[in-house]
Every structure is written in structure tokens, then in C-alpha cells.
């Protein structure tokens, strides 16, 4: 066997081993090693003190270097992927069109403070605030432009499973839900004071979303909130009173996700029964069911009206539905590693294959051309609806499972009013506007089991 160490390095290693064995009270082992080495090495109390902790330091430094190498390799792979798909236009950042902007590595900010996996994210509809929820029971508020932690919110007693900004006209609130069976409302204008707790669900509350203004002609513009739970129900709440105004049943197992349509007339949900459902909010009835996934449905999304022309081409329609239509196309992501695109009658238009593990979250680009997804395979993928849903960019975004993905909602006129603040659609009045008339914010965030939130921005 070839000698890898010089005689001096071998001597230092032996002294380090003896010092370590002595420090952990393995005196017999230490004495045996000294006897084996004989006169080739001399160890006294001064030597033991000098070499104490040496092995631990070298071990931890090796682990740190290995992690750094893995991060650099992942970043190189991501950059190579971008180069492979780059065009002269995409390389010119100065002339970037927000409608075509896609995230690229590295992230602008790595936000670290959570002590357990990050489970959910939400952008403030106007300001540069980003909320993150975690299994550590806390919600953290970050300034995503500066990359700084603003505050930590405590109140839930178990894992926080979802967060969302929205609320009554002129008064944005933050909603959160948890495995502790409750929904909590927080007031950003009053230092995120907990203004209301909504009990009622009989099991973990897995998703919460504000319903955009004017749902089904309701006079309670912006006052409505929908929640999904492991108790197999969807519940609609009036946030001004705290009362549950409607409970909807139909799923046969845990409801993992729910999202409202841009005009607030419909809900789309999915869960462990492998069925997605489209609901009419005003009647509480299921309008359509979506069958085809072979495992639990983890995430659902409504396609924005800006994407209708691309969906129409995929579906073989002669002309797209009008942009004023409330809910024409949807997407689902599953543990079967696929994403499915549907019309709202329940017909599967396209199945997107590429992820190597559970698909955990979906978001449509506000410009309508792309669908973005994150997965337990640690990647963020961008799918081009104009190229038969080809995956045009893959970013290794985290070192562990990616649990959440949110896009900062576009700024629209009358931004002080309630907006579809879930990061996947604009306000109901903004949904009718062309993408070029919206102020698209080229900012998105991902959250991971690696305890990090990453912000990607132009």
C-alpha cells in the first residue's frame, strides 16, 4: 500500500488520534496505540493539549468543503443548463422583457433563520415584504429587496402549513394556517398583531387563500377567505366577523391545496384522493372533476387570462376564450412526478414529464407564456407553453426538497384595493388587462427543507 502521508503528517495524525482518544476517556485505546507506535512518537501533557480538538476541526472542515463543492457543482450545472438554452436575446439583460423574464441562478438572496423546514411563502401585494412559514411554528417577515429579516411572528403551536396576503379593500392582512387546526389573521399595519383566530376545522389546515373581490356578486368584497383541510372540507370565512359562512365537501381524503379563480367565482382544489375539483363558490357545488393522476395531488393553479392563447393552441381551439372569462384552464402537480394541464371541463390537455420526484408547487408566469414548478428533486423548472410545454430552464435551486414557490403578484392600478395576492393571479379587475398593462414584478421565491428561502429577481 502506497504511503499517502509524509512522515511529519503521519506523526501529527497519530498525535491527533491519541489526543482525541484521551479527551473522550478511551485511555486503554490511547495506551494501546502508544505502545504500537513505540519510540517513534513522544506524547506528553503539552502535546495532548496542543493536539486536542485537531481531529474534530479537520473533520468539520472537510464536511464544509464537501458541501461547498456540492453547491458549486450544482451551480455550474445550473449555469450550463442556462447556456445550453440561451439565445442572443436572453443574454442581453438590459433589454429584458418582463413578459419573457425567467429566474436564473444564483439567487439574489439566501434568507436563513428558520430552524425547521420552510413550508410556505407569500408576497405582500404592494410592498417588498415576503412571509415564510415553517415547521418550527413561526412565520418570518423578510424584506426581499434587502434580503433582511424584519420580524418573527409567533402564535401557532404546531407547523405553519400556508400563508397568504389579501383582505378587505384598503386593508391588507396576512392569513396563516397550521397543523394546530387553526387559521390566524395578522395585521401588517399594526406590527403583525394577531387580530383574529378562526377555529373550526377538525384536522390540520393545509392551505389558505384570500378570495379576490366581489366573489359571486357578494357585497363582502375582499372579506372572504378559503381554507382546505385534512378533515376533507373546504371552508369559506368572513374575515371581518371570523364566522365560517360555508363548508364544502366532496373530496374523499386530505385536501392538500386550494386556490380561487382571478374573479373569485370559482375554487380549484386537489388532494390525496388523486382527484382535483372545480367548485362554484356561490352554490358550493362541484362543477367539474379532474381524473388522471396516479398519486396524491400536491398543488393546483388557475391559468391567468394572459395564458389563454397558448392554452388554446395546445388544446387545438380555433380561437382562445375571451380574457374576461373567469376560469378556463388549470394545472395540477402530483406525487406521480407529473404536471397536468386541463380545461375546466375536466379534459387533460397536456401532461408534463421531467421532474424526478414529487411536484410540490406550481405558479404561472404573470405574462402567461410559462409555467414554473418546484419538486422534491431540488429543481425549479420553467415550461414554455408556446413550445408544446418544453422545459426550457432547470435550476438546481436548493440542496434539499423544495416545498414552496411563489411569484410576487403584478402591481395593477388602484393597488391599494384588494388583489389576488396569492402570487399566481392579478386582481379581478387586473385579470382583464393585457400583460403589458400590468407592472409585472420579476421576483419569485422558493422555500425548502434545507431551512432556506431563496429570492430570484431580475
From Swiss-Prot:
InterPro entries: Dynein_regulator_LIS1, G-protein_beta_WD-40_rep, LIS1_N, PAC1-like_LisH-like_dom, WD40/YVTN_repeat-like_dom_sf, WD40_repeat_CS, WD40_repeat_dom_sf, WD40_rpt. WD repeats lie at residues 113-154, 156-196, 200-247, 250-289, 292-353, 354-393, 397-439, 441-458. Residues 60-87 form a coiled coil. One of its GO terms (molecular function) is dynein complex binding. Its main location: cytoplasm. One of its GO terms (cellular component) is cytoplasm. The keyword Cell division applies. Residues 9-41 form the LisH domain. This is Nuclear distribution protein nudF 1. It comes from Penicillium rubens (strain ATCC 28089 / DSM 1075 / NRRL 1951 / Wisconsin 54-1255). The lineage of its organism: Eukaryota, Fungi, Dikarya, Ascomycota, Pezizomycotina.
Amino acid at each position: 500500500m502506497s504511503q499517502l502521508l509524509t512522515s511529519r503528517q503521519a506523526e501529527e495524525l497519530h498525535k491527533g488520534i491519541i489526543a482525541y482518544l484521551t479527551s473522550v476517556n478511551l485511555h486503554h485505546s490511547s495506551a494501546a496505540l502508544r505502545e504500537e507506535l513505540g519510540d517513534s512518537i513522544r506524547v506528553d501533557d503539552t502535546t495532548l493539549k496542543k493536539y486536542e480538538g485537531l481531529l474534530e476541526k479537520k473533520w468539520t472542515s472537510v464536511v464544509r468543503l464537501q458541501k461547498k463543492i456540492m453547491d458549486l457543482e450544482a451551480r455550474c450545472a445550473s449555469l450550463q443548463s442556462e447556456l445550453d438554452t440561451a439565445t442572443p436575446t436572453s443574454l442581453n439583460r438590459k433589454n429584458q422583457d418582463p413578459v419573457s423574464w425567467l429566474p436564473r441562478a444564483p439567487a439574489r438572496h439566501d434568507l436563513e433563520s428558520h430552524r425547521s423546514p420552510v413550508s410556505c411563502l407569500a408576497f405582500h401585494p404592494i410592498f417588498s415584504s415576503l412571509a415564510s412559514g415553517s415547521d418550527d411554528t413561526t412565520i418570518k417577515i423578510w424584506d426581499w429587496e434587502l434580503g433582511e429579516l424584519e420580524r418573527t411572528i409567533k402564535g401557532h403551536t404546531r407547523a405553519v402549513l400556508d400563508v397568504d396576503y389579501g383582505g378587505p379593500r384598503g386593508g391588507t392582512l396576512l392569513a396563516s394556517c397550521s397543523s394546530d387546526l387553526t387559521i390566524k389573521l395578522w395585521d401588517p399595519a399594526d406590527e403583525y398583531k394577531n387580530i383574529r383566530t378562526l377555529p373550526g376545522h377538525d384536522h390540520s389546515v393545509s392551505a389558505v387563500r384570500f378570495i379576490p373581490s366581489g366573489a359571486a356578486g357578494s357585497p363582502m368584497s375582499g372579506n372572504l377567505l378559503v381554507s382546505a383541510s385534512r378533515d376533507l372540507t373546504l371552508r369559506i370565512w368572513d374575515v371581518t366577523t371570523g364566522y365560517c359562512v360555508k363548508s364544502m365537501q366532496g373530496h374523499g381524503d386530505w385536501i392538500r391545496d386550494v386556490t380561487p379563480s382571478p374573479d373569485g367565482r370559482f375554487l380549484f382544489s386537489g388532494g390525496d384522493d388523486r382527484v382535483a375539483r372545480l367548485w362554484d363558490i356561490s352554490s358550493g357545488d362541484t362543477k367539474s372533476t379532474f381524473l388522471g393522476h396516479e398519486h396524491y395531488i400536491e398543488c393546483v393553479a388557475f391559468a391567468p387570462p394572459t395564458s389563454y392563447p397558448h392554452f388554446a393552441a395546445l388544446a387545438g381551439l380555433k380561437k382562445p376564450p375571451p380574457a374576461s372569462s373567469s376560469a378556463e384552464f388549470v394545472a395540477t402537480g402530483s406525487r406521480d412526478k407529473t404536471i397536468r394541464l386541463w380545461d375546466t371541463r375536466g379534459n387533460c390537455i397536456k401532461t408534463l414529464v421531467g421532474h424526478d420526484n414529487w411536484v410540490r408547487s406550481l405558479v404561472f408566469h404573470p405574462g402567461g407564456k410559462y409555467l414554473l414548478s418546484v419538486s422534491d428533486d431540488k429543481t425549479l423548472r420553467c415550461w414554455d407553453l408556446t413550445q408544446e410545454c418544453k422545459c426550457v430552464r432547470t435550476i438546481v435551486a436548493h440542496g434539499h426538497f423544495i416545498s414552496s414557490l411563489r411569484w410576487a403578484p403584478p402591481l395593477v392600478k388602484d393597488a391599494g384595493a384588494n388583489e389576488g395576492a396569492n402570487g399566481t393571479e392579478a386582481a379581478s379587475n387586473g385579470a382583464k388587462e393585457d400583460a403589458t398593462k400590468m407592472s409585472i414584478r420579476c421576483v419569485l421565491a422558493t422555500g425548502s427543507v434545507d431551512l432556506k428561502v431563496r429570492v430570484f429577481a431580475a
